[in-house]
Amino acid sequence: MSDSPVDLKPKPKVKPKLERPKLYKVMLLNDDYTPREFVTVVLKAVFRMSEDTGRRVMMTAHRFGSAVVVVCERDIAETKAKEATDLGKEAGFPLMFTTEPEE
């Protein structure tokens, strides 16, 4: 055996620096053809909003041209926006949801 001293001090653990994922907004865009009631139904179904919240978001988009529906991680935002837009297409409406980075 060797006579050299053994260093028994534990090595400090290096924790990887984790960054929060960037957030994205799902935006509802106003159009002049999709019935308000249908928009509210889609908001309730896809984004699990209450009737009142769905109406408020829908009316905000109607008045201002667009409204923030939800802010979440990119993959979730893109999935929800596509699902909601597809429901509009299936019903024959030009309902449009988009995503954009949260600032």
Swiss-Prot record:
<protein>
    <recommendedName>
        <fullName>ATP-dependent Clp protease adapter protein ClpS 2</fullName>
    </recommendedName>
</protein>
<dbReference type="InterPro" id="IPR014719">
    <property type="entry name" value="Ribosomal_bL12_C/ClpS-like"/>
</dbReference>
<dbReference type="Pfam" id="PF02617">
    <property type="entry name" value="ClpS"/>
</dbReference>
<dbReference type="GO" id="GO:0006508">
    <property type="term" value="P:proteolysis"/>
</dbReference>
<comment type="function">
    <text>Involved in the modulation of the specificity of the ClpAP-mediated ATP-dependent protein degradation.</text>
</comment>
<dbReference type="InterPro" id="IPR003769">
    <property type="entry name" value="ClpS_core"/>
</dbReference>
<dbReference type="GO" id="GO:0030163">
    <property type="term" value="P:protein catabolic process"/>
</dbReference>
<comment type="subunit">
    <text>Binds to the N-terminal domain of the chaperone ClpA.</text>
</comment>
<comment type="similarity">
    <text>Belongs to the ClpS family.</text>
</comment>
<dbReference type="InterPro" id="IPR022935">
    <property type="entry name" value="ClpS"/>
</dbReference>
